[in-house]
């Protein structure tokens, strides 16, 4: 079992580390910041939203950064906490669990999961205004 899961897990962890160290998350945040303003979301929440589908620990680090800069009781901290609870590590779970059982075609699992996460994010943003 471990030999089946380990390559998928290692590839996901390496990809996340590369994304963070390359600065791509920061560039995507700067690129998407105007769209955040249009929907009434703080742009500081973007790294959390970008990392959460891939890694829970990377998203937790982004949450800790938000708590350190804004405080957990601030509007940003409250919204980030709700977002963290209403989203899931979609790609990590797909890579790990589907890889473990040898499923090659995930069919509708990823699109439906992303749609559910989008619904959770929008609901969280509406409730935390």
Task: Annotate each PLM feature.
Residues 1-68:
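Membrane-embedded alpha-helical segments and adjacent helix-loop junctions characteristic
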Residues 61-66, 70-129:
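C-terminal transmembrane helix pair
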């Amino acid at each position: 079992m471990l030999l089946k899961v380990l390559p998928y897990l290692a590839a996901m962890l390496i990809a996340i580390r590369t994304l963070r160290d390359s600065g791509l998350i920061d560039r995507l945040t700067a690129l998407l910041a105007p769209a955040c303003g249009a929907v009434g979301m703080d742009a500081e929440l973007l790294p959390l939203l970008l990392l959460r589908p891939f890694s829970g620990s990377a998203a937790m680090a982004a949450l800790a950064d938000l708590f350190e800069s804004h405080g957990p009781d601030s509007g940003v901290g409250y919204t980030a906490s709700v977002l963290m609870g209403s989203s899931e590590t979609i790609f990590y779970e797909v890579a790990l669990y589907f890889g473990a059982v040898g499923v090659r075609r995930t069919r509708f699992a990823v699109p439906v999961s992303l749609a559910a996460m989008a619904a959770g994010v929008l609901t969280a943003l509406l409730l935390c205004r």
